[in-house]
């Protein structure tokens, strides 16, 4: 029997913690963009760098160990600094239902302290999601090795982990794109992930999703993919769904996902057929036995636009490969899906990129002439063929 909850639901408390220089920078850019219903926390061993943070809560960790002078690119010092300041970290996390821990892997503070912070958050009962970057190849083997160890430590500490190799930034931006603008693309994975989840649990829908649904999909699931796609006009539902599951910045593909939370937001013209079209695209790209939780929201302000939000987990954790100049930006497409407006002017990819959005899905799994056919279409045809044979 289906049961429907009525009445007021307490909104989940979301906190974003930036650890180290890279994490602090990501938090600053999120704050500059403007986000509601989220608390920001900056953690660093470097007191001078911490003073530049725009977060409302700042924690200088390891004051006795480092005297505020940083971790010297030594992850062990970063780890010990976080352990020294455990009580301060616990106080900052207190009351959070969901915690995003973001950092750049390869240095000292982020690599060493972020797993400690994430472990504390999870031990305190918060749904804990890590969003980390791997260093560029040109940063050297030592930094790459430290980053790999940091990623493994994060995997052990969080519920789900999203990894962004910085080298992928070279695949999605033009040669003339300024460095800081390129880094914003990586930050979009975090920003739009937080925004998407915040909107899912804050906005009531015709078919409603809540924080319990988010926990079902993301608790203890390893790697994760989060995507947002927006489209309008003809085939808008299909195009939005394709964009949402195509993330060339991420190490994880939706192919084989065993858990998917999907939400479709549209104007009053959103039809049941369009909802089915979008759901079919996502379901056919995932595992055959996927556990899919589906919701819809009607927002008259969107008019002709449809926004598809996808959270996918339950993978085999095999890194994916991507071709250059693949479709959309890191978190599906660069859109703000708040209930007030949808912004489409943040993408740094070319105008033709949307037409290529599904290529990255097929590139991850096939190297034959069938590469021109998106894998979710092949999967759908194979399933239909099996049903016919039965």
Curated annotation (Swiss-Prot):
Q: Which domain of life is it from?
A: Bacteria
RNA-binding as a keyword of this entry, yes or no, is no
> What keywords would UniProt list here?
Cell cycle, Cell division, Cytoplasm, GTP-binding, Nucleotide-binding, Septation
Is Transport among the key words of this record?
Answer: no
Per the UniProt entry, the effect of residue 380 to A is:
Does not affect interaction with FtsA and FtsZ
The protein's predominant localisation is cytoplasm
Residue numbers spanned by region Disordered: 315-390
Single GO cellular component term: cell division site
Question: Matching Pfam families, A to Z?
Answer: FtsZ_C, Tubulin
Which InterPro entries does the protein's record reference? Cell_div_FtsZ, Cell_div_FtsZ_CS, FtsZ/CetZ, FtsZ_C, Tub_FtsZ_C, Tubulin/FtsZ-like_C, Tubulin/FtsZ_2-layer-sand-dom, Tubulin/FtsZ_GTPase_sf
Q: Where in the cell is it found?
A: Cytoplasm
| Effect after changing residue 376 to A | No interaction with FtsA, but does not affect interaction with FtsZ
The record's comment on protein family reads: Belongs to the FtsZ family.
How is the subunit organization of this protein annotated in UniProt?
Homodimer. Polymerizes to form a dynamic ring structure in a strictly GTP-dependent manner. Interacts directly with several other division proteins. Interacts with FtsA.
Task: Describe the task this protein carries out.
Answer: Essential cell division protein that forms a contractile ring structure (Z ring) at the future cell division site. The regulation of the ring assembly controls the timing and the location of cell division. One of the functions of the FtsZ ring is to recruit other cell division proteins to the septum to produce a new cell wall between the dividing cells. Binds GTP and shows GTPase activity.
Q: What is this protein called?
A: Cell division protein FtsZ
Q: Which gene encodes it?
A: ftsZ
């Amino acid at each position: 029997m289906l049961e429907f909850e009525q009445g007021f639901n307490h909104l989940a408390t979301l906190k974003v913690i930036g650890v180290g220089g890279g994490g602090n920078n990501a938090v600053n850019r999120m704050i500059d963009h403007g986000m509601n219903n989220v608390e920001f926390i900056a953690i660093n061993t470097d007191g001078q760098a911490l003073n530049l943070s725009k977060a409302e809560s700042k924690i200088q960790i390891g004051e006795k160990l480092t005297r505020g002078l940083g971790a010297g690119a030594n992850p062990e010092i970063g780890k010990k600094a976080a352990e020294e300041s455990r009580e301060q970290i616990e106080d900052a996390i207190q009351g959070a239902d969901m915690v995003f821990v973001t950092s750049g892997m390869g240095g000292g503070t982020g690599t060493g302290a972020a797993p400690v912070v994430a472990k504390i958050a999870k031990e305190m009962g918060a749904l804990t999601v890590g969003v980390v970057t791997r260093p560029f190849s040109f940063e050297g083997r030592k930094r790459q090795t430290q980053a790999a160890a940091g990623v493994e430590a994060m995997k052990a500490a969080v519920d789900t982990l999203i990894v962004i190799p910085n080298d992928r930034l070279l695949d999605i931006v033009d040669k003339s794109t300024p460095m800081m603008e390129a880094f914003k693309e990586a930050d979009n994975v975090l920003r739009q992930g937080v925004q998407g989840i915040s909107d899912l649990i804050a906005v009531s829908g015709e078919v409603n999703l809540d924080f319990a649904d988010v926990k079902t999909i993301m608790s203890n699931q390893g790697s994760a993919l989060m995507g947002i796609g927006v489209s309008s006009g003809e085939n808008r539902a299909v195009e939005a769904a394709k964009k949402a599951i195509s993330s060339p910045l991420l190490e994880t593909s939706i192919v084989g996902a065993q858990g998917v939370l999907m939400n479709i937001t549209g104007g009053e013209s959103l039809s049941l057929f369009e909802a089915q079209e979008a759901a079919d695209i996502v379901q056919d790209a995932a595992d055959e036995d996927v556990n899919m939780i589906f919701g819809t929201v009607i927002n008259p302000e969107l008019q002709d636009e449809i926004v598809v939000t996808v959270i996918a987990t339950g993978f085999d954790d095999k890194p994916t490969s991507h071709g250059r100049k693949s479709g959309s930006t890191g978190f599906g497409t660069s859109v703000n899906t708040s209930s007030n407006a949808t912004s489409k002017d943040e993408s740094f990819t070319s105008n033709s990129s949307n037409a290529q959005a599904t290529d990255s899905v097929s590139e991850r799994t096939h190297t034959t002439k069938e590469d021109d056919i998106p894998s979710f279409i092949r999967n759908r045809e194979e399933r239909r063929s099996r049903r016919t044979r039965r």
